[in-house]
């Protein structure tokens, strides 16, 4: 199984890189994990709605190029479904049973995701109504993916 994490923007903070690197190492027992960082568009200070739409559209084009036709795509969006960790674990296990070999998670940039990416997604997922920096969300999601595999294994990691 392959798990891809497509992210808009570059990870800058060392502590986030270290945390994600640790979970990538742990995940290597269960899957091939790949994090793909895409260039984000600069958003002007007083960007109009049209400016924001254009920025999201450009970012969506970059994202779309990294999605394979047979990927099961889960896009993170505030309006998405929320799951307890156990249900998330079942979801990941169920995707492979349905014949998908790659799960692709998408985290948009500071403006979110363009509707074309949300429409392509097999599922929209949310971590709640809180607003989190998208760079921090990478670490949180990577940990939850690891936790999902540990739950499937019956590991005491998830208590």
Curated annotation (Swiss-Prot):
Molecular function as annotated in GO: rRNA (pseudouridine-N3-)-methyltransferase activity
Keyword Hydrolase set for record: no
Originating species: Streptococcus pyogenes serotype M12 (strain MGAS2096)
UniProt GO cellular component terms: cytoplasm
The EC number(s) this enzyme carries: 2.1.1.177
Gene behind this protein: rlmH
Name the record gives this protein: Ribosomal RNA large subunit methyltransferase H
Free-text function comment from the UniProt entry: Specifically methylates the pseudouridine at position 1915 (m3Psi1915) in 23S rRNA.
Alphabetic keyword roster: Cytoplasm, Methyltransferase, rRNA processing, S-adenosyl-L-methionine, Transferase
Subcellular location: Cytoplasm
Entry similarity comment: Belongs to the RNA methyltransferase RlmH family.
Pfam families: SPOUT_MTase
Quaternary structure annotation from Swiss-Prot or TrEMBL: Homodimer.
């Amino acid at each position: 199984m392959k798990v891809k994490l497509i992210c808009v923007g570059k990870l800058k903070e060392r502590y986030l890189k270290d945390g994600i690197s640790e979970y990538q190492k742990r995940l290597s027992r269960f899957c091939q994990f790949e994090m793909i960082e895409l260039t984000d568009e600069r958003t002007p200070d007083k960007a109009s709605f049209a400016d924001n739409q254009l920025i999201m559209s450009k970012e969506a084009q970059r994202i779309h190029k990294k999605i394979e036709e047979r990927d099961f795509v889960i896009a993170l969006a505030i309006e998405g479904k929320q799951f307890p960790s156990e249900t998330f674990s079942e979801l990941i296990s169920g995707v492979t049973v349905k014949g998908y070999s790659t799960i692709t998670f998408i985290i948009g940039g500071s403006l979110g995701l363009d509707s074309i990416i949300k429409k392509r997604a097999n599922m929209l997922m949310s971590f709640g109504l809180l607003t989190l920096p998208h760079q921090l969300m990478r670490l949180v999601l990577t940990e939850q993916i690891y936790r999902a595999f540990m739950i499937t294994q019956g590991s005491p990691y998830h208590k």
